[in-house]
A protein has these predicted regions:
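C-terminal motif of bacterial Sec signal peptides marking the signal peptidase cleavage site
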Residues: 14-17
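Bacterial N-terminal signal peptides that target proteins for export
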Residues: 1-7
């Protein structure tokens, strides 16, 4: 398994019902671009100030008050990425997944687009007509028993699902950090409204990772040092919870990482 962006998922698609000639097209992209307004979630409260996000070359600068974080790289291991049909309770509930469009089953390392790169290159695949309501996936901690080949190709991700590098600045004092997490969690990102694929038409879906909320403190009022959220650190559980609440999926007809 290579260190890849989302475009490489096309190499291992396993779509059901693609023998039908009257099919449509569904594409999936990835963005870390900040939404125009923070989506309602546990990551933000109505009384907290949202961090500001600025593109700085190939890095992303997150600022709140006198503190800032420069993110230079951010990688996440995903698996079982599936677009869920409106009449299915869960993609895992149906053997064979004929009722869900399956983008990826095995562990896949994706690199989040940072800086001036607003969206990862899209992939488009054939899909039967239908109405879809959510994107299901797992943030996956690779294990030696299930993911030996993946770990051999990506040794830094043995029992690690997320790796971020950058610089943390508190009141002008800077320190470099490497943040890793072993979050192992199923996620469902509900689309704002059901999306329909018609025969011969296309549906563009983007998964947003709201990086600006990952390193907020419990009160959502200040940034924490990402290094303090490593295994056993004081902010490990706070940041893990922020991460699990940072995903949104939406139709993206303009391919710009923003809803609409």
């Amino acid at each position: 398994m290579k260190n890849v962006t989302l475009v490489a998922l096309a190499l291992s698609f396993a779509l059901a019902a693609c023998s039908d000639s009257n099919i449509g097209t569904v594409s999936l992209a990835l963005t870390a671009r900040q939404a125009a307004a923070p989506a309602p979630s546990a990551a933000f409260s109505s009384t907290s100030a949202a961090p500001s996000v600025t593109a700085t070359g190939d890095s992303t600068l997150i600022t709140l008050g006198n503190d800032s974080i420069v993110i230079r790289s951010a990688q996440v291991v995903l698996r079982k990425v599936e677009l869920k049909r409106s009449d299915v309770a869960s993609c895992d509930a149906v053997a064979g997944n004929d009722d869900c469009e399956e983008f990826e089953t095995g562990a896949t390392l994706v690199t989040l687009p940072l800086g001036s790169t607003t969206i990862a290159q899209q992939v488009s695949v054939a899909a039967p007509p239908g109405t879809f309501t959510a994107l299901e996936f797992e943030i996956h901690k690779p294990s030696s028993s299930e993911d030996a080949a993946f770990i051999a190709a990506n040794p830094d991700f043995a029992a690690i699902s997320i790796r971020v590098t950058g610089t943390y600045s508190q009141a002008g004092t800077r320190s470099s950090f490497t943040f890793t997490s072993d979050v192992d969690q199923s996620e469902e990102a509900t689309l704002p409204s059901p999306a329909t694929i018609q025969a011969g038409q296309s549906l563009n879906v983007t998964l947003r990772v709201e990086l600006s909320g990952w390193y907020l403190n419990g009160a959502k009022t200040a940034l924490v040092d990402p290094a303090s959220a490593n295994k056993g650190g004081a902010n490990e559980s706070v940041v893990a919870n922020n991460i699990q609440n940072s995903f949104q999926a939406f139709e993206d007809d303009n391919h710009d990482g923003l809803e609409g």
